[in-house]
Amino acid sequence: GIENVVVTSQDPHAFLKDFEGYFDCVILDAPCSGSGMTRKKEKMEDDWSWEKVEKLVPIQKDLIELAYKLVKKNGLISYSTCSYAKQEDEQIVCYLMENHEVELLNIPDDGSLKGIEGIGRRYIPGLYKGEGQYQCILKKLGDSIENDFQPIEYKRTIKGFDNFYAVKY
């Protein structure tokens, strides 16, 4: 497995103090209205609303800004949602592109559809295995703080996980 990956659902604002400009890549699966989950939810029409979209857009903008601050120069941001609403997808990416130096990277055609105005990819059930998704990959070009982070050469065992991967017969 990959040893230098952390998966968290903690408030990302907590990372800024110690890790601004630190990460090679931030994968942001943003909270969204879930409009791409139509096959999974029996009563999607009861769960989805424009009000929900409008409530989530400021959160998504805040999170993509944080992702931008956390990646180092030339680092990557993968932004995804399980929504089809352009307000939660392409418009969030455009917001970042209008406010920061980023490069929109091409995602190869893998059966998905190009996003609106060619921004990112849309994964549609029936055309792609899985639920509905949106994804975009951006490369940070500018506005990066200089840091003196050095790689740490040690193995740390988290209490309770020391035998997590041990094979037992």
Positions of predicted regions on the chain:
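S-adenosylmethionine
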Residues: 1-169
